[in-house]
Amino acid sequence: MGVREQILEDIKTAMKSGDHFRRDSLRMLNAALKQVEVDERISLSDERVFSILQSEIKRRNDSAAQYRAGGRDDLVQKEQGEIEIIASYLPAQLSDAELAAAASSLIAQLGASGAKDMGRVMKAAKEALGSSVDGKRLSEAVKAALK
C-alpha cells in the first residue's frame, strides 16, 4: 500500500474512532496532495508524496514560529500536533552522525574542496539520500563537512 492510500485509510479510521483532530489534519494533507496532482496533471509517486509531506511540515514549522512570536500557544500546539501526524508518514530520518558520515563520503567521492562545490555536493546528496533527510539538515551537514 502506498503512502497516499495509507493516508486515505487513516482518514477512515479516524472518522470511525471519532478522532476529529487527526481526521481534519489528514484531510488537509490529502487536499494538499490532490492539489498537486490536479495542478501538475500527474499521479504522485511515493517519493513525490514524501517531498510534499516535507513541504507541509516546513509550512507548519513556520506557522508555529509565527504563532509562538505572537503568544498563541494554543495554535502552536495545534501545529505541533499536525507536524507529528505528517511526520509519521515519512521514512525514518537519518541521525546526525549518519548524515555527517554520508556528507563526508559524498564530498570525498566528488573531490569537493570548498564552499564553491556546495551545489554539486547538495545535488548528489539529494539524489543519494532522497527523502530520508530534511533539506535544511542536509545543507548544514554539507557546510560543516566542507569546512
Enumerate the predicted regions with their spans.
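N-terminal cationic and glycine-rich segments that engage phosphates or anionic surfaces
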Residues: 2-89, 93-115, 123, 127-130, ...
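Function-critical acidic carboxylates
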Residues: 120
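Active-site alpha-helix of zinc metalloproteases
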Residues: 136
